[in-house]
Amino acid sequence: MINLLVIYLLMCNTIYMRVYLIPSHQKKMSTTTVNQVSSQYAIYENEKKIASIPYEVLRVASQFVSKDYSRQLLMGVHLKVENDEITVASTDGHRLFYFKFPNNELGFKLNKNITISGSVFKSQIKNATKVLITDNLITFMNEEIFLSSVHYQQFEGTYPNIEQLIPDSFTNNFEKEFSFNCDYIGQFCNQVKKLSSNKAITFKGNKPTTPFVITAKWNIKNPFESLEGFDPILNYLIMPILKRD
């Protein structure tokens, strides 16, 4: 069995960055800690506002960041705003999670692109519904009630262009046998069970040599229920494992 590599090239100020989907046995472990602060409201009011994001999507994204400190950008959850749409994304180089939703709707907004350590969001914050982000502070909220805050530092550098990995369309016409890493599938399913009432996932793909996208509908703790015409879909991109001929 072989694990296919998805390699793409990103240029930024004449600096080229390669991001690989690599075998899982090569991953290294690392941890990041944050310091909790008091007087959340007073501190928050003095900070420059960056974003207000649904808590659950940040928590899910944090489950799929890299644990390899040598690839620090991939240890972060990336928030991107483009064409009035916010993308929350994370990848460890093996799989990619992303969720897209409208900017400036239902109080959710993003003023600039930013990458934040996934460790900030990994722990379950009881009753949290949204996260307020400033230049130096992340505040967990229950509607308009402040729950807790942590200081953080933004990751410097240009996050990989994930759009280059996502297929534009799907034929769903497969001519060759293929398999998936069961751990990667199971880890996404564990998150889907918390956010989807029917606990169902859908596979979409073209051929086993290109990425597949697994989707699930978000309808538990979904803050977008009142947003007409928007279908909240969790997306999980993963490469098949092919047998050698």
Question: Residue locations for each model-derived region?
Answer:
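DNA polymerase processivity clamps
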Residues: 5-7, 17-245
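Short, positively charged and aromatic/hydrophobic N-terminal segments
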Residues: 13-14
